[in-house]
Amino acid sequence: MNCLLKTFAAAALSLTTMAVFAVPSQLKTHNDTDFQSNAYVGPSLDIASPHPTKAHSTNSVFWGVVQVICGKRTGTCNALIKMKTDTASPVTIGQVTLNLDTGDITPKSLTANGFTITVIGPGETRITQD
C-alpha cells in the first residue's frame, strides 16, 4: 500500500512538473498600435516571419510553426521586431530572445522609436505606441 501511494505521488509530481514547464500552444502578439508589426529571424535577423500582426489585432501562431520559422525545435531563437512593416520605411523596436523550451521572452520590456513591447506571459507580448 505504501509503495502504491509513493508511485501515485511520484506520477502526480511528474505531471505537475511537466505542466509547469510546458511550452505555450501558441505565440501571441497583441498589437495595440496603428501599424503592422513583424518579427525577423535567421542568422542575420533578416528573414521576415510570414505571419505579421496587423494594427489593432491579436495574432496567434502555433508553437510548432514558431519552431519551424526559427529553424529549430529547442534552445533559443532571436528575433528583430519591427513596426510599419507594410510601408517603405519600417522602424526597429529591437531584438528579443524566445526560449523555445519554455516560451520565456527576454527582455521583458523594450522601448524604441515610439513603440514598447511588453511580455505579458510565456509566448505572449503586447505592443503599444508611446
Residue ranges and their predicted role:
Residues T17-A19:
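N-terminal signal peptide c-region/cleavage motif recognized by signal peptidases
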Residues M1-A9:
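Bacterial N-terminal signal peptides that target proteins for export
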Residues F21-D130:
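Intrinsically disordered, low-complexity segments enriched in small/polar residues
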